[in-house]
C-alpha cells in the first residue's frame, strides 16, 4: 500500500471541490482532489435529464471562465458538467479520479488525519 502526504485533501471533484481547488491554488496551498468517479459525475448521471442550473450562466460561472451558452440562459446539466471539467483543466486542478475515500482517522502522532482510499 502506498503512502503520500498533502497539506489539504479535498474529497469530491464536483462544483465545490473544483472551486476549493481554485482557491487553494490561488493561495499557494498544496492540495489534492480525489473523486471516486469522474469530475462532475453527479451532474451527469444523478440528475434528471431536464435539469438546468438554478441561475443564469452569468451568475453561476466561476472566475475567469464563461459558460458556452448565452449569459442569461440556464445551462443544462450536461453543459454544467462539461463546464466543470473544462474549468478543472483550465486551472490545472490536481484531481485524481477513480479514487474513493474509504476511511478517515485522526492522526495521534501529529496534527492531521490519516486517509485511506481505494488507491492506498
Language model segments and positions:
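Short polybasic/polar patches that bind polyanions
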Residues: 25, 63, 89
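Glycine-rich active-site loop/strand segments that organize a redox cofactor
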Residues: 41-81
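Conserved Rossmann-like nucleotide-cofactor binding loop
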Residues: 16, 38-39
Amino acid at each position: 500500500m502506498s503512502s503520500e502526504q498533502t497539506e489539504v485533501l479535498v474529497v469530491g471533484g464536483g462544483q465545490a471541490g473544483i472551486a476549493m481547488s481554485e482557491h487553494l491554488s490561488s493561495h499557494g496551498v498544496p492540495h489534492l482532489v480525489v473523486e471516486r468517479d469522474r469530475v462532475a459525475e453527479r451532474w451527469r448521471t444523478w440528475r434528471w435529464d431536464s435539469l438546468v442550473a438554478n441561475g443564469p450562466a452569468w451568475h453561476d460561472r466561476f472566475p475567469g471562465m464563461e459558460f458556452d451558452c448565452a449569459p442569461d440562459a440556464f445551462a443544462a446539466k450536461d453543459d454544467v458538467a462539461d463546464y466543470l471539467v473544462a474549468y478543472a483543466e483550465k486551472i490545472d486542478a490536481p484531481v485524481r479520479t477513480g479514487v474513493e475515500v474509504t476511511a478517515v482517522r485522526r492522526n495521534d502522532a501529529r496534527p492531521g488525519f490519516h486517509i485511506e482510499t481505494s488507491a492506498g
